[in-house]
Each structure stands twice: as C-alpha cells, then as structure tokens.
Swiss-Prot record:
Organism field: Mycobacterium bovis (strain ATCC BAA-935 / AF2122/97)
Cystine connections: none
SUPFAM superfamilies, sorted: MFS general substrate transporter
GO CC terms, sorted: plasma membrane
Coiled-coil region: none
Domain of life: Bacteria
Positions of region (Disordered): 428-512
Protein name, entry field: Uncharacterized protein Mb2232
Keywords linked to the UniProt accession: Cell membrane, Membrane, Transmembrane, Transmembrane helix
Transmembrane segments: 25-45, 55-75, 96-116, 123-143, 148-168, 183-203, 238-258, 263-283, 294-314, 329-349, 359-379, 386-406
Entry annotated with the keyword Transmembrane helix: yes
Compartments (UniProt record): Cell membrane
UniProt keyword Cell membrane, yes or no: yes
Length: 512
C-alpha cells in the first residue's frame, strides 16, 4: 500500500460515516420542520395568499440557480475545510427559518418575507448540494454514498416525526397558527444542531484540481458544457435528470392540492417523515439489487401511482379525507426522495475528480432552470381543485420519466481499491473517443480546448500510419547492435500509430 494512502486512512476519522449521518440527520429534520416546499405553502394557503404559495418554489429555484453558479467559487475558497462551509450553511438556513417564524403573519408583508427567505434558502441549498456532493465523494467510497443519503433521510425523518407528535403538542397552547410557529422554531433548532455536528466531521483528505484552481465563472461553465458535448454518458445523465425534475416537485404539488383541508399541515409533516423512513429502507434494497436504474424507475412508478390515486379520489369526492391526500402525498414523498441520491450515485462514479464539481454545478443549474419554469406551472395548476386535468399532466410526466429511466446504469460495482477514483460501473461502461482521466493535470487553456482535442484525436486515429521510411526519420534512427531487437525512437508517438514509446519493435519490422 502506498504511503500516501496509508497516511490518509490513518488521518481519517474512525466513525466518519456516523458523523456524516448525525450532521445530515439534523439537517434533514430541520428542513422538514421549516420546509419551504410543505410548511410555507400551507401557511400561505391558510392566510389566503394562494398566489404566494404558487411562487414559493419558483423563488427557491431561482435562488438555487444563483447558488449553483456561485458554488465553484465558494468551494475554491473553502478548499479542504468543507466541514466549516457546511456549518456556515446550516447556520444561515437556521437564520432564515427564524425570520419566517419571527415575522408577523398578517397582510401581504408575510408573503414578501416568505418569498425573500425562500429565495435566499435556494441560494444556500444550491451551494450546499454541490459542496456536500463533492465532500462525500472524496470521503466515502461509491457504495457508501447512496447508503449515506438514505440513512440520513431516515434518521432525520424519525427525528422530525418525534418532534411533531410529541414536542409540538406539548408546546402549542393556542390555535393552529401557534403550532405552525412551533414547527418553524424547532426546525431552526435542528439546523443549529446540524451546524454543530458538521464541525466534528473534519476536513477533506484531498481537493480536486478544478476546485483548487481559481477560474472565472464563465470559463467554468464553458468547460462544463464542452465536456458535456464530448461525453455521451453525461448527456444521457443530464437528459434523464431533467426528465425527473417533475418527480421532485411532487411533494409541493400534492401539498398544494391538499392545502384546503383543515389540519392537513401536521398530517403532511408526519407523513413526509414516515415516507423518508420507509423510502430509506426500500431504496437501499433496490439500490443494491438494481442500481440507479431501479431507483429511478421505482421513483417514477410511485409518482404515477400517487397521481392515479389522486384522480380516483377526486372523481369519487374522497380527496378531502386524510387517508386519500395523505396516501398520495406519502407516495410522492417516497418517490422524490431517491432522485437526488440516484443522480449523485450516477455522476460521482463516472465523473473524474478534477471535473466533478464543475459537472455537478452545470447539471444542478440546468435542473434548477427547469424546476423554476415547472414550479410556476405546477404551482398554479395544483390549486385548480375543481378540475382533474392538472393531475393528468403530472401522470403524463411520470410516465415519460419512467421510460427515460431505462437508460440509466444498473448496479455499481467497486474494485478492490475503494477510493472514489477506482469506482467503476459493471453494467455500463461508456466508450468515448478520448476519455478524460482523473490523474491528468490541466491548465485553464486545456479546459477550453476539450472539444478541439477530442476532434483532433478522432481525426488522427482514423488517418493511416505514416510510412516508416521517411527521410527525416531515417536520419534520426540508430542502428541496433547485431543480435539485439531494435528499439523505437525516443520521440513521443501518437497513440494512433499503435507503438508505445520505448516499446520493442517486431523482428521483421524495418527501422525508421
């Protein structure tokens, strides 16, 4: 074993997985209790601000676009101290939830505050998604990353369920709005605990070349799109990820669909927590058996089942009951849980370390742009309770996503070397003309010439090999000693020639 790897393994925390679970569990619980996708839309609907409820998720997506754009620059400054960055992110999210709980919930002013804090929360989430994905990709092997995300979701859901069922009834002694205030305050407390737990995670063992080299934001996106154009696996990944954005919006859609029912908020919060617990156990087994393809296909089918249940319940006049909208919301929650975990498992294995943060940033930005447009559309049509065609739209999008999931890779296998760079796919190996190796050292001009280098390599590989008896080569050749095999010229040779530098030539081959 190399000494560098031995030092890294010795310096890594022994219970790193448990510390990451604790940090992510508190973060998940805090976001559930102060969720801008479930809690704030229901509060706006109860206050009669239906227009604000439909604009909350688009505001979040706009902030996420800005956060994704700023994330490479922030990661460059953070370096290996990602645990401090995650602590700052948790503290900022807690401050935003406190603002939502402290502002008076009267008039149009509360809608403006909710929209502003939701947009700022999108910025925080955009930075957090890229930073956390890159951090766990460096700290954990490929087979543990999806398990970590599902375990964090389960731990956070259990905590949020216990708080909602036990602590909130003990604290709330007023009307329904008093309970909503308590939910937000407890959500802020969970985010503070997440920030404290992040301090014990420790710094990263290594940082990728892309994040260590400071580059302008324009060049970062130019490099990301150049790689996307030249790498078929990333185009396939990005197309599938964009088609699954409506699945991620399922929780917001069905929460707005059930917002008119009295007492629906606590039911939705509890069911979202239960859904994450059930989904954690379900998706972990599916991930081990069927890989990313099974995760995405199961997610699309569950979302389609939720839409079908909603259509049947509304047609029969049963949607106002808790069992109807609660079951549909539970299915949508389980379906949306695995979209992020599947995308992280997909891209963290295939993306080289030097390009990982850039590709995650580009993919998250495109997904946020689509979520902004779809969020406005779905948030508006979800509140049309008198018609059933909005649910038909959701069902159609789920069927399209299910078909697209068949192109995803299956099980992910890891070789004897469990480092992130050694992770490989068993059933899906992309064949590219000029694959990008993770051990290369690049400069900003190389990033800008990825596409040109790919085309030059393909062109040179199809050209016939140059003749070996060129005058320039004959003058530079050395005659071998009698009885010894000839050696190739020490000058670098193109891989298309078929002879490696310094490799012995065949006995019947002429000397150049």
């Amino acid at each position: 074993m190399p000494a560098s790897r031995l030092v890294r393994q010795v310096s890594a925390p022994r219970n790193l997985f448990g510390r990451l679970v604790a940090q992510g569990g508190f973060y998940t619980a805090g976001l559930q209790l102060g969720s801008g996708a479930v809690v704030l839309p229901v509060i706006c609907a109860h206050q009669g601000l239906t227009w604000a409820a439909g604009l909350l998720y688009p505001a979040f997506c706009i902030g996420a676009i800005l956060g994704n754009s700023l994330s490479p620059l922030i990661l460059q400054r953070a370096g290996q101290l990602r645990h401090l960055l995650m602590a700052a992110i948790s503290a900022t999210a807690a401050a935003l939830v406190v603002c939502n709980a402290a502002v008076p919930w009267t008039g149009v002013g509360v809608a403006a505050v909710f929209l502003a804090t939701t947009g700022a929360g999108g910025v925080v989430t955009g930075v957090s998604s890229v930073a956390y994905t890159d951090m766990i990709s460096s700290m954990l092997p490929a087979v543990r990353r999806g398990e970590l995300l599902l375990t964090q979701g389960a731990a956070g859901s259990v905590l949020a369920t216990g708080v909602t069922l036990v602590i909130v009834p003990m604290l709330a002694h007023g009307n329904e709005m008093a309970r909503y205030h308590d939910l937000l305050w407890l959500g802020a407390a969970g985010l503070v605990c997440s920030g404290i737990a992040a301090l014990f995670v420790g710094p990263m063992r290594s940082v990728s070349v892309t994040t260590a080299t400071r580059m302008p934001l324009r060049e970062i996106y130019w490099m990301g799109f150049a790689i996307a154009r030249s790498q078929p696996w990333f185009r396939r990944y990005m197309t599938t990820y964009l088609l699954f954005v409506p699945i991620s919006l399922g929780t917001t859609f069905f929460s707005l669909r059930a917002a008119q029912s009295n007492g629906s908020l606590h039911v939705l919060v509890i069911l979202s927590s239960i859904g994450l617990v059930v989904g954690s156990m379900l998706w972990r087994q599916i991930n081990r058996l069927f890989g990313v393809r099974g995760l995405l296909l199961g997610s699309a089918l569950l979302n389609a089942a939720a839409a079908l249940l909603c259509m049947v319940a509304e047609s029969c006049g049963q949607w106002v009951h808790a069992w109807a909208y609660g079951t549909a919301f539970l299915l949508a929650t389980v379906a949306a849980q695995t979209v992020v975990a599947a995308s992280i498992s997909w891209i963290s294995v295939l993306a080289p370390e030097r390009y990982r943060a850039t590709l995650i940033c580009v993919g998250s930005t495109l997904a946020a742009v689509e979520a902004t447009v779809l969020g406005v559309a779905l948030g508006g049509i979800a509140q049309k309770h008198a018609t059933i065609w909005p649910v038909v739209v959701v069902l159609t999008l789920a069927v399209i996503a299910a078909v697209a999931s068949l192109r995803a890779p299956t099980r992910i296998g890891v070789t004897a070397d469990t480092s992130p760079q050694a992770a490989t796919l068993q059933a899906y190996r992309p064949a590219t003309p000029n694959p990008i190796h993770s051990d290369e050292r690049s400069t900003p001009p190389d990033h800008l010439s990825v596409r040109r280098g790919q085309l030059r390599h393909v062109w040179d590989s199809r050209r016939p090999a140059p003749p070996l008896n060129r005058p320039s080569c004959r003058r530079a050749a050395r005659r071998p000693a009698p009885g010894k095999p000839a050696a190739a010229l020490p000058q670098p040779r193109h891989p298309a020639v078929g002879v490696r530098e310094g490799a012995p030539l065949d006995a019947g081959q002429r000397i150049a």
